[in-house]
């Protein structure tokens, strides 16, 4: 039995989630809420500058999209409470707008009839469970929560990495820097922004700014609260980012032992270890949350460790959104099966 999902928002993440979800046999994309006509949405799904041509053909139809024999209803309403989720029997509303990341706002999808909500960004408050695959997904609780957050792309990268290091060697403290590709939050040319550095042209400079990844990490790895802090450098590339993590460990280790810990972590599909001397473009459309750059692992004084982890901040993250949606759907199905028996 497949899970009925609706996607609110057709920006970068919304479109990538749609591409991935359409090829997941456990998910049924029923509806999309977006402000653009079907022709525009279909074109931007079929053709993508960063990730290339889609291997399925998405065609515009009246008030919707069609992929083979599958039809997707297209609606356009900026108030989620007005959306036809009850009528369409939506199990999970995936909100990819970034506008409803507070639980008090996201609950509008529940009021509209969706059983659960999944946010494609870190929660800004309210009764929301933050879930990161490979970190705390075993604690996903559909009884206690109706709204879930898939955190950020950076938290999805650093989370599994920090968990492995902490479990194997113990983290005393550390600092992280994410070297992050351009996002829609930046300006192509100088224009006002509440962050004056992000007000500057994203194509011309390396831009130091903040990241919420270390703060969000405490939501999924509470044992590391107060132990990690960090910042971001926005760089003029279109996609693929990395986390540069430096930590002091409780145990003395070698670089080989650190890399082996990631190899043996058992996080298939989440962490990958790369031994080739690659560059950012080589990780474009890589579905993993974190790709350890084994050649860059360093150890100093026995317990000070530097780890570089690459991540496709669009495609890798969107894969995790779909994974979490699939997990929520499976739990809903199991609950309904038990209730019916």
From Swiss-Prot:
It is an enzyme of class 1 (oxidoreductase). One of its GO terms (biological process) is glycolytic process. InterPro entries: GlycerAld/Erythrose_P_DH, GlycerAld_3-P_DH_AS, GlycerAld_3-P_DH_cat, GlycerAld_3-P_DH_NAD(P)-bd, Glyceraldehyde-3-P_DH_1, NAD(P)-bd_dom_sf. Its EC number is 1.2.1.12. Keywords: Cytoplasm, Glycolysis, NAD, Nucleotide-binding, Oxidoreductase. GO terms for molecular function: glyceraldehyde-3-phosphate dehydrogenase (NAD+) (phosphorylating) activity; NAD binding; NADP binding. This is Glyceraldehyde-3-phosphate dehydrogenase 2.
């Amino acid at each position: 039995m497949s899970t009925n999902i609706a996607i609110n928002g057709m920006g970068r993440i919304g479109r990538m989630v749609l591409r991935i979800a359409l090829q997941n046999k456990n998910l049924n994309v029923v509806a999309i809420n977006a402000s653009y006509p079907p022709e525009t949405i279909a074109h931007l799904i079929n053709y993508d500058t960063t990730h290339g041509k889609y291997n399925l053909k998405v065609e515009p139809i009246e008030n919707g999209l069609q992929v083979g024999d599958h039809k997707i209803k297209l609606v356009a309403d900026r108030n989620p409470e007005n959306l036809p989720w009850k009528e369409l029997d939506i199990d999970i509303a995936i909100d990819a707008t970034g506008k409803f990341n507070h639980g008090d706002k996201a609950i509008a999808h529940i009021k509209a009839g969706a059983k659960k909500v999944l946010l494609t960004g870190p929660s800004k408050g309210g009764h929301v469970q933050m879930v990161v695959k490979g970190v705390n997904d075993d604690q996903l609780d559909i009884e206690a929560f109706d709204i879930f957050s898939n955190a950020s792309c950076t938290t999805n990268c650093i989370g599994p990495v920090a968990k492995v290091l902490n479990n194997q060697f113990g983290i005393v403290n550390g600092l992280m820097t994410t070297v992050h590709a351009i996002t829609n939050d930046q300006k192509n040319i100088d224009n006002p922004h509440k962050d004056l550095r992000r007000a500057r042209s994203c194509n011309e400079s390396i831009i130091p700014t903040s990241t919420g990844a270390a703060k969000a990490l405490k939501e999924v790895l509470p044992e590391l609260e107060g132990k990690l802090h960090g910042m971001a450098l926005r760089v003029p590339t279109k996609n693929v980012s990395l986390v540069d993590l430096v930590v002091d460990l409780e145990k003395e280790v070698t670089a080989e032992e650190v890399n082996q810990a990631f190899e043996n972590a058992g996080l298939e599909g989440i962490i990958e270890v790369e031994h080739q001397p690659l560059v950012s473009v080589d990780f474009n459309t890589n579905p993993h949350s974190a790709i350890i750059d084994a050649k860059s692992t360093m150890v100093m004084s026995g317990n000070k460790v530097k780890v570089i982890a690459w991540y496709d901040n669009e495609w890798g993250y969107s894969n995790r959104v779909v994974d979490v949606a699939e997990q929520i759907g499976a739990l809903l199905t199991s609950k309904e099966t038990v209730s019916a028996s």
